[in-house]
C-alpha cells in the first residue's frame, strides 16, 4: 500500500474521483466459513457493474456507510447499512452464519474500507482496457480503515444495518491484555530517577 500517489493526486486542482470499496470477511470460528465478500456502492464511478481493484472484483451492491469521521475524544463507530434485496440477500447470509453461532448476526466479522482514486483503478474497468484517468496502480490507496461488526442495529425486508467498532473498542476486549509488573519488566518505575 502506498499513500504518496493518492495524497499527491488529491492536492491537484482537478483530482479524479475517490472510489470507496468494502470487504467483509467472515471468521471461521464465529461464522463457520472464511468467505470474503467484496462490494462497492456504485456511486463513485459511473458503472452499473463490478469494479476491479488490485485484481479483485468488487460487486455493485446498494450500501451506505456513515460515521467514519474521527471526533475529538472518541473513536468512530460507523454504521454500515446494506440492501436486503440483493442475491444472495443479507438475511440469507445471516441465516447461514447463525447456524454456526446462534444469534451471531455477523458480529465479529471484519469490515475493511478501502479508498482509492479512479485514476489508479485497473484497466479492466474501462472500455478498450485503458484507464482514461491515469495509470493503474494497485498499491495506491488511502490508509485502509479496519473495523469489526459490533452489533446488528436493525434488520427488515429492505435493509440490514450494523454498528462497526475498532478491534479494541469491542465489548469484552481489554487493553492491555498483559499486565506490566516489575518482575516481568525490570525497568518499570525507574524512569526519571
Show which residues each predicted segment covers.
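Short solvent-exposed strand/turn elements
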Residues: 156-180
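Polar/acidic, low-complexity leader/linker segments enriched in S/T/G and N/D
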Residues: 1-60
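Short coil-to-beta-strand transition motifs
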Residues: 54, 136-148
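Active-site-adjacent substructure of cysteine-protease-like catalytic cores
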Residues: 120-141
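Residue-level recognition of beta-strand microenvironments
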Residues: 151-154
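Ubiquitin-like/PB1-type beta-grasp interaction modules and other compact soluble beta-rich domains
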Residues: 5-9, 157, 177-193
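Extracellular/virion structural assembly segments
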Residues: 66-122
Amino acid at each position: 500500500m502506498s499513500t504518496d500517489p493518492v495524497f499527491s493526486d488529491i492536492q491537484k486542482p482537478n483530482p479524479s474521483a475517490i472510489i470507496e470499496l468494502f470487504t467483509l470477511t467472515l471468521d471461521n470460528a464465529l461464522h463457520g466459513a472464511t468467505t470474503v465478500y467484496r462490494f462497492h456502492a456504485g456511486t463513485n464511478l459511473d458503472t452499473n457493474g463490478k469494479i476491479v481493484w488490485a485484481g479483485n472484483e468488487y460487486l455493485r451492491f446498494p450500501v451506505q456507510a456513515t460515521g467514519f469521521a474521527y471526533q475529538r475524544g472518541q473513536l468512530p463507530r460507523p454504521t454500515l447499512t446494506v440492501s436486503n434485496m440483493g442475491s444472495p440477500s443479507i438475511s440469507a447470509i445471516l441465516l447461514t452464519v447463525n447456524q454456526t453461532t446462534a444469534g451471531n448476526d455477523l458480529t465479529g466479522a471484519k469490515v475493511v474500507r478501502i479508498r482509492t482514486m479512479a485514476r489508479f483503478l485497473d484497466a479492466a474497468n474501462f472500455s478498450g482496457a485503458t484507464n482514461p484517468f491515469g495509470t493503474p496502480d494497485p498499491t495506491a490507496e488511502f490508509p485502509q480503515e479496519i473495523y469489526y461488526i459490533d452489533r446488528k442495529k436493525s434488520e427488515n425486508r429492505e435493509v440490514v444495518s450494523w454498528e462497526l467498532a475498532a478491534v479494541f473498542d469491542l465489548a469484552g476486549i481489554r487493553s492491555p491484555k498483559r499486565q506490566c509488573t516489575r518482575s516481568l519488566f525490570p525497568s518499570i518505575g525507574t524512569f526519571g530517577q
